[in-house]
A protein has these predicted regions:
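ADP-ribose/NAD+-binding catalytic cleft of ART/PARP-like enzymes
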Residues: 1-40, 53-56
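Short, solvent-exposed loop/turn segments at secondary-structure junctions
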Residues: 21, 46-48, 89-91
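Short helix/loop capping segments that flank catalytic or ligand/cofactor-binding pockets
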Residues: 24, 49-51, 94
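Aromatic-enriched hydrophobic runs in primary sequence
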Residues: 38, 44, 84-86
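Short C-terminal domain-edge/linker segments immediately following a structured domain
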Residues: 42-47, 120
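Short active-site loop/helix that positions an aromatic residue
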Residues: 45-62
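Active-site and NAD+-binding cores of ADP-ribose-processing enzymes
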Residues: 59-154
Length: 154
């Protein structure tokens, strides 16, 4: 893993979480890094949904948790997830992106996917405070709207 410091993002940030976490997050007024070094966000709803496609929507796929232990993604239930649209409050801390590193000879397709994955996420080193009353989007509804949008093909 290679972290790269970036400028503080401008505008809104998006963070997906399980519905069961919402009450505590709203009471707390912050997204906590928990066992990680950073808490992670996306710059748009579209990026958030794509990140979810590459992670929590990959039922049964292997990943490594924050303790470095191998795990498998459980069955994805869209109704269990929400996306918070956040206005960050000013605070000190480093903003980073995480650049996936690959061994020499890694297939180009895998490298491109890793680059996309790395640039979907924006990390904040610390707990990110946000202004009250963030918009909360239902992931099930977002996915339904996404599939109903007309697809233009050429």
């Amino acid at each position: 893993m290679a972290y790269e410091r970036i400028d503080r993002p401008k505008g809104l940030l998006y963070h997906y979480t399980k519905r069961e976490n919402i009450e505590l997050i709203l009471q707390d007024g912050r997204i906590r890094k928990l066992r990680d070094t950073e808490c992670w966000f996306c710059a748009s709803l579209e990026d958030t949904l794509r990140l979810m496609e590459l992670t929590v929507m990959e039922e049964g796929k292997l990943y490594y948790d924050t303790n470095g232990l191998p795990r498998r993604y459980p069955k994805f239930i869209p109704e269990e997830y929400v996306v918070l649209e956040l206005s960050p409050r000013y605070q000190n801390g480093d903003w980073v992106i995480w650049n996936q590193e690959f061994p020499d000879g890694a297939p180009e397709e895998i490298q491109k996917l890793g680059e996309e994955f790395s640039h979907l996420k924006i990390g904040f080193r610390g707990d990110l405070r946000f202004y009250e009353n963030p918009n909360i989007y239902e992931v099930a509804q977002l996915l339904q709207e996404q599939t109903q949008a007309p697809q233009i093909t050429m």
